[in-house]
C-alpha cells in the first residue's frame, strides 16, 4: 500500500455535495433528520431510555489493505479501541518535530487567532489548530505512511485530515479535560455521519503517570453514550477550554469503568497513540514539573465527510472540521 505523496494541505479535486448521491438536504438538519434516522442521537432534552446505544459501524474496516499495522495490532485496536506504538519516531526526526512545535507555539501572531486556544487562567497557548496548514513539516507528517497509512487500514479508505492540532499541557498549570467521545462532538456539531474516523496522537514529550496523560476506557468504543443538554450557540468557544456539553453521565461512566477499567498509555517521546473516534477518554491536570505535548491528527474517510450538524444550529468553524478540499491560504 502506498499513501499518496500529495500533501494533505494542498488542493485536491473531489466531488462536491451536489455531485454526490448522498448529498445532504439543503433545508438543514431538521429536514435531514426527517428523512434519515439518526443512529447516534445526542444533546437530548430528556434522559435517554437506554444508558448507551450499540455501535452501528465496524471498527477496523481495512484489514485487506497493506500498511504499517500488523494483524495483531489491528486485533488489539478492534478489541480495545486504541493502540499505542512506542518509539515510532526517534533521534533527529523527533528533535526536529519538537523544535517545530516550539516555533509554532511561541509565535505571537497566533495568540489572538480563532485557531489558537489559551489556558483558561493565562495567555499561554494550550492548543493550536490547523497545524498541517501552518507547518509544511507537519503537513508532510500527516501524509506519512506510518501515520496516514495506519489510519487507512483502520478506516478502510483514503483518509483526509478532519482536524489537526498541537496540544501543550505545561507543568503545574496544565488543566485536565472531561470524559467525552470525540465522535459525539463531531457528529452533533460538525455533522460527521458515521464512525469512520480515527485519531493519531504523536507524543512529543515523555508521558508518565504524573503529567496528565490521556486516559481511555478500553471497549467503550463499542457503545455510543447519548448526552443531555442542547448545544449552546458557538459552543466551541468555551468547550475547547472546558467541556461541559457532550459529557457522558456519571452513571454511564461508572458502569463502563466497572466493566472495562481505565488505561493510560505511557512511554517515551516519539510514541504514537491511535484511538477510535468513539473511545471515551479524558485527562487529569498536570501537577508535575514536566510539560506534556503532542501533535494530533484526526483522519476521516472521504465518503464520511461532514454534512449538516445533527444537534447544532450550524457547523463549527473549518479550523475544527476541515473539508477534504480545504485550502491552506486562510491560515497563512
Residue ranges and their predicted role:
Residues 89-91, 166-169, 173, 184, ...:
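Short, solvent-exposed loop/turn segments at secondary-structure junctions
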Residues 90-95, 99, 198, 204-227:
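Internal hydrophobic scaffold segments of catalytic domains
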Residues 175-181, 188-190, 210-216, 225-229, ...:
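A short secondary-structure junction signal
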Residues 251-316:
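Catalytic core of Fe(II)/2-oxoglutarate
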Residues 157-164, 175, 194-202, 212, ...:
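Generic beta-strand structural signal
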Residues 209-279:
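Double-stranded beta-helix
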Amino acid at each position: 500500500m502506498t499513501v499518496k505523496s500529495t500533501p494533505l494541505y494542498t488542493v485536491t479535486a473531489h466531488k462536491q455535495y451536489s455531485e454526490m448521491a448522498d448529498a445532504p438536504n439543503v433545508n438543514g438538519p431538521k429536514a435531514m433528520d426527517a428523512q434519515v434516522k439518526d443512529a447516534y442521537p445526542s444533546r437530548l432534552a430528556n434522559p435517554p431510555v437506554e444508558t448507551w446505544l450499540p455501535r452501528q459501524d465496524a471498527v477496523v474496516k481495512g484489514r485487506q489493505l497493506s500498511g504499517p499495522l500488523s494483524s495483531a495490532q489491528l486485533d488489539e485496536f478492534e478489541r480495545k479501541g486504541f493502540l499505542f506504538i512506542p518509539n515510532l519516531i526517534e533521534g533527529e526526526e523527533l528533535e526536529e518535530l519538537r523544535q517545530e512545535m516550539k516555533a509554532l507555539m511561541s509565535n505571537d501572531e497566533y495568540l489572538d487567532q480563532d485557531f489558537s486556544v489559551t489556558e483558561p487562567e493565562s495567555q499561554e497557548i494550550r492548543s493550536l489548530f490547523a497545524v498541517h496548514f501552518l507547518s509544511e513539516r507537519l503537513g508532510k507528517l500527516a501524509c506519512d505512511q506510518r501515520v496516514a497509512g495506519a489510519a487507512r487500514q483502520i478506516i478502510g479508505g483514503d483518509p483526509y485530515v478532519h482536524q489537526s492540532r498541537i496540544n501543550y499541557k505545561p507543568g503545574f498549570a496544565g488543566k485536565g479535560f472531561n470524559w467525552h467521545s470525540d465522535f459525539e462532538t463531531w457528529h452533533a456539531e460538525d455533522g460527521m455521519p458515521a464512525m469512520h474516523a480515527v485519531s493519531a496522537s504523536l507524543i512529543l514529550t515523555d508521558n508518565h503517570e504524573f503529567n496528565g496523560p490521556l486516559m481511555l476506557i478500553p471497549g467503550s468504543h463499542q457503545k455510543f453514550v447519548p448526552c443531555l443538554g442542547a448545544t449552546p450557540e458557538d459552543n466551541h468557544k468555551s468547550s475547547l477550554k472546558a467541556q461541559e456539553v457532550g459529557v457522558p453521565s456519571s452513571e454511564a461512566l461508572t458502569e463502563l469503568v466497572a466493566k472495562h477499567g481505565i488505561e493510560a498509555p505511557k512511554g517515551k517521546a516519539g510514541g504514537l497513540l491511535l484511538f477510535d473516534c468513539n473511545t471515551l477518554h479524558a485527562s487529569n491536570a498536570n501537577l508535575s514539573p514536566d510539560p506534556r505535548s503532542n501533535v494530533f491528527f484526526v483522519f476521516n474517510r472521504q465518503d464520511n465527510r461532514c454534512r449538516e450538524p445533527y444537534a447544532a444550529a450550524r457547523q463549527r468553524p473549518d479550523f475544527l472540521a476541515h473539508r477534504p478540499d480545504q485550502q491552506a491560504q486562510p491560515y497563512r
